[in-house]
Amino acid sequence: MAKDDVIEVEGTVIEALPNAMFQVQLDNGHKVLAHVSGKLRMNFIRILPGDRVKVELSPYDLTRGRIVWRGK
């Protein structure tokens, strides 16, 4: 899958799950299961419930995503 094919949306982390997985409530109301991208993991970026995040979704499975950015 090419980088151009991803769908970027913003949301809020509502729950931290085991294995660096998070339940994210998107701005459009949907909930997705998201994991932390490699760059955030390498730089030890902490993600807590309530944080604003940017999530990349695959067009093939819109229920799972990758967290690529953390706001305040």
UniProtKB/Swiss-Prot annotation:
Belongs to the IF-1 family. Residues 1-72 form the S1-like domain. It comes from Caldanaerobacter subterraneus subsp. tengcongensis (strain DSM 15242 / JCM 11007 / NBRC 100824 / MB4) (Thermoanaerobacter tengcongensis). One of its GO terms (cellular component) is cytosol. The lineage of its organism: Bacteria, Bacillati, Bacillota, Clostridia, Thermoanaerobacterales. HAMAP family: IF_1 (MF_00075). The keyword Transferase does not apply. Component of the 30S ribosomal translation pre-initiation complex which assembles on the 30S ribosome in the order IF-2 and IF-3, IF-1 and N-formylmethionyl-tRNA(fMet); mRNA recruitment can occur at any time during PIC assembly. This is Translation initiation factor IF-1. One of the essential components for the initiation of protein synthesis. Stabilizes the binding of IF-2 and IF-3 on the 30S subunit to which N-formylmethionyl-tRNA(fMet) subsequently binds. Helps modulate mRNA selection, yielding the 30S pre-initiation complex (PIC). Upon addition of the 50S ribosomal subunit IF-1, IF-2 and IF-3 are released leaving the mature 70S translation initiation complex. Disulfide bonds: none annotated. SMART domains: S1 (SM00316). Keywords: Cytoplasm, Initiation factor, Protein biosynthesis, RNA-binding, rRNA-binding. GO terms for molecular function: ribosome binding; rRNA binding; translation initiation factor activity. It is found in: Cytoplasm. It holds the Pfam family eIF-1a. PANTHER family: TRANSLATION INITIATION FACTOR IF-1, CHLOROPLASTIC.
